[in-house]
Amino acid sequence: MKKLITLFTMLFMSACLFAQVSEGEKHALLDFYISTNGDTWNTTWDANTPVAEWHGVTVKNNQVVAVNLMFNNLKGHLPTSIGQLENLQSLELSFNQITGTLPVSIGGMTQLKTLAINGNQLEGTIPESLGNLSNLEQLHLSSNNFSGSIPSSLGGLANLETLNVFDNSLTGTIPLGLSQFSHLKKLVIAENDIIAADTFAQVNLFEVDNDNTLFKTPKTFKEKTVLAIETSDDTD
């Protein structure tokens, strides 16, 4: 009996040791590594080790659920294949030197809750496909070179809590749908040429107090969710 228990224990440990993410996810990560010059990162990846041991990568139940590579000297572009990380819940690539455009394929990563690519050199328009990220709570795209308008599709992200597009070259108006979201706590649009529509008010945003978000709501906006539009004097 003792030998049998030992055998099962060894088989279990062996299964855990050799458990890996799917080939599709690993391929997407390696594409990403190559396209952002992984060999010159501050902390690189060793492809001969399990993906779970790669710097900044979080694996749960053999699925890649988070990639956090802030301040890691990423240079290059984001490959279309990044959309194959369909189980990803958090993608944090802020403060690197990523260029090119934001791949439309990111709109297929429907488990994403956080997408943060602040302080890079991305350009072009913000893809309409981001409106497919129904679980998205945090969207941070500040200090890039995005142009065009904020996609109207973002007005359908009912779980969005923060939209930060500070310091880009965006124009147009804020999507009307965002004015009706009770979850939205912070809207940062300063240092663009965005026009605030009548559905938004210049108000002060306070910290959340337990379950109550403390907004000062002008009487004319009683029927709407009032959001904070931060100015260039803000540091967040």
PLM features: residue spans?
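Consensus "Asn ladder" position of solenoid repeat domains
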Residues: 72, 96, 120, 141-144, ...
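LRR flanking "cap" motifs
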Residues: 34-77, 236
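Mid-chain, structured segments of secreted extracytoplasmic proteins
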Residues: 61-97, 217, 231
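Short N-terminal segments immediately surrounding and downstream of signal-peptide cleavage
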Residues: 21-36
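Leucine-rich solenoid repeat scaffolds
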Residues: 161-236
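Bacterial Sec-dependent N-terminal signal peptides
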Residues: 1-23
